[in-house]
Structures are given as C-alpha cells and as structure tokens.
Amino acid sequence: VRTLSVLAAACLLALPAWAGQPSSALVVVLDAGHGGKFPHDGAHGAHGLLEKNVVLAVAQKTKELLEAQGATVLLTRESDLDVSLADRARIANDAGADLFLSIHCNSMETREDRKVTRGVETYFLSPDPTDAEAKMLAELENGGPESIPLPKATNAVIGILADLALGQARNDSAALAEIIQHHVIRGTWAQSRGVRQAPFLVLSGTKMPSALVEIGFISHPDESRLLAKTAYQDKVATALSNAVRDFADRVLSRRLVAQAVKPAPALKGSEQPAAVNVATELPLAIDAVATEPQAAPAQVALPANAVARPDGTR
C-alpha cells in the first residue's frame, strides 16, 4: 500500500492534465492587445483594418472554445477599452491565473516592408531582446523604451524564493511560446517567424507563465485580408485554444500531484501502513516518471500525407 500510494501519485504526471479532471481547474487570462483611442488603438492595417478589433475577436473566440471545455477564462478587455499594461497584468495576478496570453497583430512602417513582411511570431519575456527588431517591437508595444521593473525582496529568503519562482515561470513561458507558435503555424499554415524574446512590460508584471503572440502582419495586403475573415480568425482561435490545452497538460500535472497526495484510508490493527514520507519519496517517484521518454508538443510531426507548402515543407 505504501509503495502504491507514492507510485499512484507520481503516475498522475503521465496523464493529460484534463484527463478525468474538471477543466475548471484551469484559469486562463487572454489579453486582447490595445483598445481605445489613439495612441493606444494599435496598428492600422490595409483596407482600414484595425489591430484592436481583430485581436479582440480572436480573444473572444478563444475564450468560447476554452470555456466550452470547462476552463475559467478572463479577458483583460471585452470591448473597445484602453486598459493599462499594469492593469492587464494585475487582472491575471488577482485571478491566480495558470497562464497569460497577450494577442496582437504586427505591422511594418515603410511601404516596401509592408508589401513583403508577413507571418507569425511568439514572444516570451526577457530583458535581452532577440535582435534590434524585437527590441523595437517591445518599445512600440510598451509605449516607449521603458525598462522591466524588477521585484523587490524584503529579505534574503524572500528574494531567493522570488528568484526561484520567477525563474520557473520564465522557463515555462519559453515552453508556452514554443507550443503557441507550433499550434498557430500548424493550424493556419502561416509563415513562421519563430519564437523570440523581448522586454514586454505587459509580460513583466505577471507572476505566471506568459507569452505574447503576433498572429500576423496587419500591414501586409494579403495577410490583412486573411485576418479580417471570420473563418481565419476561427482557425487562429482554435490553434490558440489547442496550445493552451497542450501547455495545461504540463502545468496542471504538477498541481494534481500537490493536490492528490492524501493520506491513505486508515486500516485496522496490523494492517495500518507506515506513513509515506512525501518530501523524500514523491520527488523520487516524480523523477522516475520524468525520465520516461515523452514527445515534445513543439516537435510533433505533420502527417506523411500532409499537403506541401509552396516552399516544399509540410
């Protein structure tokens, strides 16, 4: 009984997070970027399309898909409102969200760049931007070249714990960005501009894994037409909801272990089992499960009969 109790708890890690578990255990905050009037109304695209309207529609569709499966989903804005970056992060923190996803459309300034630049890219927080382009985008979204505010610790112990928590959240954020990029590209077949990092203020204020996805270039004539179509917005929303579920399998598995390890029912007399030392034995069981080979979601191959893209890839 003693051994089985530990192994049963550890085996939860091998199960999908939503398997046999109410999806209401998952709390997601979706952030539709920008909103309100100039200068916070976001990018203006071809054919009069506005970023703030596209991303709100996608966020609302993604919310519906996740709620249909029982998840709790909050939007940082539900209409054309100007919500500060600090308030967007506060909404996620106050909700105790498991993840935060900020949805945006990209844009280029020059006429030549607007004709040729298109595709999807996903960002996670880092004070060191991938390149000059990532740095400029962060400054644009931040409203200026502001630096990331670092949390202040009241003492050494709290500082260490805060660093550990932030470190884990940032590692998880990188994984979240990879999973989002994979699913959006797979679901829309848009051009992939990869996973990148930059100092986005809206991400710096969150205490949970977070990412920012640019679902396309609203400045590109063809991509703008796609982003305006309800059917394409549905594809993006489906891809984002699949990405959230994929990532939740990892996040909730840790929570399930913490919540599910409970004392075994008391037995009579000599049948009473020895107490399980969870602090020492559960980590060993978890390590054993963790060593089992598992496919990384971001590396899932497309079917062999998938239609090839124009560049020959599948």
Task: Write out the residue ranges for each language-model feature.
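Active-site-adjacent mobile loop/cap segments within catalytic or ligand-binding domains
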Residues: 26-29, 40-43, 49, 109, ...
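Catalytic-core regions of hydrolytic enzymes
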Residues: 20-150, 167-178, 234, 256-271, ...
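Bacterial N-terminal signal peptides
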Residues: 5-16
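The feature captures the short pre-catalytic strand/loop hairpin that immediately precedes
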Residues: 136-162, 215-224
